[in-house]
């Protein structure tokens, strides 16, 4: 970065390591997004085994490209680096910080047995176990890799290691985590989990080597990060019980803050990354990717996303009796069924691509409602739902989410909420704001509010009832097809 006058604005360099791409932003200390760049990387998958892996070196290359792109804008002086990443994923590294194998990402299903075993031993489930089930799987199934591994890290922690040279396990205030003795008894050496640091604290300073690789000055404070979903909560402006959000993105999901713990089958329930609150919600598998799948794989990429959504908007609510199940990669919350598959139901000659596109968009909203239904039944009350990510750029998509769920919907000023959340965490870490709630309140804004249309409630209630019944109805047939029995 070229030298600048003292009057240059102070900014945070925020790195959001998502499932399909990294987003890097320059964010002002009042929350304005001044520059954004992104770069992608592939995922290696094998549906037969449940494998889903990525190359950590590909992450670093993508980060380097994106950082250099935003730094060319010269919009300000970087005073901190904030981090978040997808998860629960696992990166195994040696003593020098080099990966000993590909990263096992959250879509990988090979460690389900280890997940259950760790849950039984610790009382923790879901995100609270981080990448530990995958680490235990590596210890049991890949002894050569395990022997070469010094540290098991989350995605955001491996970025901090690469930037500063310091291994650490970043945990939110009050976040439960298994103790080393319990891990040892299960066969996962607790010594391979780095010492804990508080998310939002300074891990270290940017090393000269990392600074040269990224094209920025050394010595910038690097702040301990968190999972992208939690960063998105911060970036969306969630502060109070009843604040909810849909993170958008490749998977889709729903999360809400509440004032007490809730036990909801099929959903995660843990502390919130804010003291005194609890977080409950679920992440789907591929609802956000379904529109792109249809646009690229089925239609051959002949339309832009905007043009396809315009066609979807030209069809009636309910897509003239067409319903879509968005389980293109199995489903996580609330079904937790990796064998689930997608389906169009009710298809006829009267349906065109606009109908199919609308059915896919409506299915993403139905999936949110499916997760939220159990949470509301357990006692939570949704005050508003903030919609984020790429889908929130579409007025149609936002309105459909309001209509289908019945929730008041708010659109944040910065849709890249994980980027914004990483910046909020980093700004707090260097003392730019007195505390995290103040930073969230001061660095997040709402630009649009949408209300559900009451005249569509009965229609979408009927659709949701059909949506819930459809998966159990066709699941036996789907399994027969997968097993070659039909």
Can you say where each PLM-predicted feature lies in the sequence?
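Active-site nucleophile and cofactor-binding loops and adjacent substrate-binding regions
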Residues: 54, 80-85, 104-107, 126-131, ...
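A short helix-loop
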Residues: 132-144, 161-166, 182-186, 190, ...
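N-terminal glycine/serine-rich phosphate-binding loop of ATP-dependent small-molecule kinases
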Residues: 1-101, 148, 212, 216, ...
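ATP-dependent carbohydrate kinase catalytic cores
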Residues: 176-275, 286, 303-306, 310, ...
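Activation-segment/catalytic-loop signature of the eukaryotic protein kinase fold
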Residues: 318-411
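Acidic, glycine/GT-rich loop-and beta-edge segments that sit at the periphery of enzyme/chaperone cores
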Residues: 262, 431-486
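Glycine-rich phosphate-binding/hydrolytic loop that grips phosphoryl groups
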Residues: 232-235, 284-285, 292-295, 362, ...
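Gly/Ser/Thr-rich active-site cleft segment
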Residues: 17-19, 122-227, 329, 357, ...
């Amino acid at each position: 970065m070229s030298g600048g006058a003292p009057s240059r604005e102070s900014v945070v360099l925020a790195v959001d390591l998502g499932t399909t791409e990294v987003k890097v932003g320059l964010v002002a200390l009042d929350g304005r997004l001044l520059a954004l760049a992104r770069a992608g990387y592939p995922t290696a998958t094998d549906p037969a085994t449940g494998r889903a892996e990525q190359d950590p070196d590909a992450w670093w290359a993508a980060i380097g490209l994106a950082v250099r792109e935003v730094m060319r804008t010269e919009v300000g002086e970087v005073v901190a680096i904030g981090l978040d990443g997808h998860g629960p994923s696992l990166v195994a590294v040696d003593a020098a910080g080099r990966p000993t194998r590909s990263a096992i990402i959250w879509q990988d299903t090979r460690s389900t047995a280890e997940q259950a075993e760790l849950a039984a031993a610790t009382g923790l489930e879901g995100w609270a176990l981080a990448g530990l089930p995958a680490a235990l799987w590596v210890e049991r199934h890949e002894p050569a890799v395990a022997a070469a591994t010094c540290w098991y890290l989350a995605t955001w922690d491996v970025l901090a290691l690469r930037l500063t040279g310091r291994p650490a396990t970043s945990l939110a205030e009050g976040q439960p985590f298994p103790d080393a003795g319990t891990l040892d008894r299960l066969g996962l050496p607790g010594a391979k989990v780095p010492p804990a640091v508080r998310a939002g604290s300074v891990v270290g300073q940017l090393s000269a080597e990392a600074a040269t690789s990224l094209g920025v000055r050394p010595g910038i404070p690097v702040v301990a990060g968190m999972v992208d979903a939690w960063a998105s909560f911060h970036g969306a402006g969630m502060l109070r019980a009843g604040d909810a959000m849909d993170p958008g993105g490749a998977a889709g999901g729903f999360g809400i803050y509440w004032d007490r713990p809730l036990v909801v089958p099929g959903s995660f329930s843990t502390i919130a990354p804010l003291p005194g609150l609890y977080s409950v919600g679920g992440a789907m598998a591929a609802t956000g990717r379904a529109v792109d799948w249809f646009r690229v794989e089925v239609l051959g990429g002949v339309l832009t996303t905007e043009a396809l959504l315009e066609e979807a908007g030209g069809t009636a609510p309910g897509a003239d009796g067409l319903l879509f199940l968005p389980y293109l990669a199995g489903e996580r919350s609330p079904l937790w069924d990796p064998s689930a598959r997608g389906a169009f139901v009710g298809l006829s000659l009267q349906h065109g691509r606009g109908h199919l596109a609308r059915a896919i968009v409506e299915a993403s909203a139905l999936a949110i409602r499916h997760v939220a239904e159990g949470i509301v039944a357990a006692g939570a009350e949704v005050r508003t739902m903030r919609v984020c990510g790429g889908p929130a750029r579409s007025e149609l998509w936002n309105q459909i989410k309001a209509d289908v769920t019945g929730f008041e919907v708010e659109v944040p000023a910065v849709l890249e909420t994980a980027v914004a959340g990483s910046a909020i965490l980093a700004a707090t870490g260097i003392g730019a704001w007195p505390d995290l709630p103040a930073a969230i309140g001061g660095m997040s804004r709402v630009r649009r509010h949408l209300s559900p249309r009451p005249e569509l409630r009965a229609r979408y209630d009927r659709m949701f009832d059909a949506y819930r019944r459809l998966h159990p109805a066709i699941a036996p047939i789907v399994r027969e097809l997968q097993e070659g029995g039909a």
